């Protein structure tokens, strides 16, 4: 099983429109031989098809394991993505995983969508 290069894993993968659940996930690569520890990075995943935050995490963690990586869910929330208005709002929490650090999530989203207005709040579900 090949070990994934973390740089090849997109930081953000979210649906293009609507309000949907999202999770913030830390992905760990297996340590390279001679390396003191595994490398890691945070990724944001959000999809309309997910009824529960765990649905997203289960799919993503399964995909990452196939690439030789381990994952941990850092929390979740919701994303309101209005592509026509170029606005993304991150808010709320996951009943299963607790709230994600929305500040981290929004920084990653801003990097992918630099011409968008990206905001966050801890309130709401």
Curated annotation (Swiss-Prot):
One Pfam family of this chain: Ocnus
Write down the EC number.
3.9.1.3
Listed under GO biological process in this entry are: actin cytoskeleton organization; lamellipodium organization; negative regulation of T cell receptor signaling pathway; positive regulation of cell motility; positive regulation of insulin secretion involved in cellular response to glucose stimulus
Compartments, as annotated in UniProt: Cytoplasm
Binding of substrate occurs at: 21, 94-96
Task: Write out the catalysed reaction.
Answer: N(pros)-phospho-L-histidyl-[protein] + H2O = L-histidyl-[protein] + phosphate; N(tele)-phospho-L-histidyl-[protein] + H2O = L-histidyl-[protein] + phosphate
Q: Which UniProt keywords apply?
A: Acetylation, Cytoplasm, Hydrolase, Protein phosphatase
**Which parts form a coiled-coil structure per UniProt?**
none
Q: Where is it made, tissue-wise?
A: Expressed abundantly in heart and skeletal muscle.
Q: Name one GO molecular function term.
A: calcium channel inhibitor activity
Catalytic residues (positions): 53
According to the UniProt record, list the residues that bear N-acetylalanine. 2
Any single GO CC term annotated in Swiss-Prot or TrEMBL for this entry: extracellular exosome
| Role of this protein | Exhibits phosphohistidine phosphatase activity.
**Quaternary context:** Monomer.
- UniProt family annotation: Belongs to the janus family.
Question: What protein name applies here?
Answer: 14 kDa phosphohistidine phosphatase
Task: Give the species this sequence originates from.
Answer: Homo sapiens (Human)
The gene name reads: PHPT1
């Amino acid at each position: 099983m090949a070990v994934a290069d973390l740089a090849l894993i997109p930081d953000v993968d979210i649906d293009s429109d609507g309000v949907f659940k999202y999770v913030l996930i830390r992905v760990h690569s297996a340590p390279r031989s001679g390396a003191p520890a595994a490398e890691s990075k945070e990724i944001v995943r959000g999809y309309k098809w997910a009824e529960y935050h765990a649905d997203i995490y289960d799919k993503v963690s399964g995909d990452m394991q196939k690439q030789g990586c381990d994952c941990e869910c850092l929390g979740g929330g919701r994303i309101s993505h209005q592509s026509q208005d170029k606005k993304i709002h991150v808010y709320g929490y996951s009943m299963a995983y607790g709230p994600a650090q929305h500040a981290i999530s929004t920084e990653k989203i801003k990097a992918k969508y630099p011409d968008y207005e990206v905001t966050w709040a801890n309130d709401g579900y």
